[in-house]
């Protein structure tokens, strides 16, 4: 599926939430894969993609001026991913789903 990025950019600049959703639906998986390749954490990759689109919305008044929106999103994803790596470089993460919690039987 192809989308008109120039039109999407203009619509986002005019506060069109559906245009942002269309942009997200079109690119989120690709940029998730990019972020995942950089940070090696599904949870962080999801957060990064959310941050990318939040940043687009915060800067929406200038989105129409971006010459190559796809490249802009790619570079933004890469930069935010690298920023997360610096921020969490020495942190160890455990996936909550992998944690074995003790089982307690409660009788009523």
Residue ranges and their predicted role:
Residues 1-30:
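N-terminal module of bacterial RNA polymerase sigma factors
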Residues 33, 47-54, 58, 67-79:
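Structural recognition of an alpha-helix C-terminal capping motif at a helix-to-coil junction
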Residues 13-21, 33-51:
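Short, charged helix-capping/linker segments at alpha-helix termini
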Residues 1, 65-66:
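Residue-level signature of the cytosolic catalytic core of signaling kinases
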Residues 2-5, 91-108:
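Internal acidic/polar
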Residues 61-65, 75-95:
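Arg/Lys-rich amphipathic alpha helix in sigma70-family domain 2
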């Amino acid at each position: 599926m192809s989308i008109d990025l120039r039109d999407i950019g203009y619509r986002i600049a005019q506060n069109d939430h559906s245009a942002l959703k269309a942009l997200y639906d079109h690119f989120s998986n690709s940029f998730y894969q990019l972020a995942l390749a950089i940070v090696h954490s599904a949870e962080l990759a999801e957060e990064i993609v959310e941050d990318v689109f939040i940043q687009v919305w915060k800067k929406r008044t200038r989105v129409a001026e971006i010459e190559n929106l796809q490249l802009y999103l790619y570079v933004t994803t890469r930069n935010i991913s690298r920023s997360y790596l610096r921020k969490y470089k020495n942190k160890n993460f455990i996936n909550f789903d992998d944690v074995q919690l003790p089982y307690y039987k409660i009788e009523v």
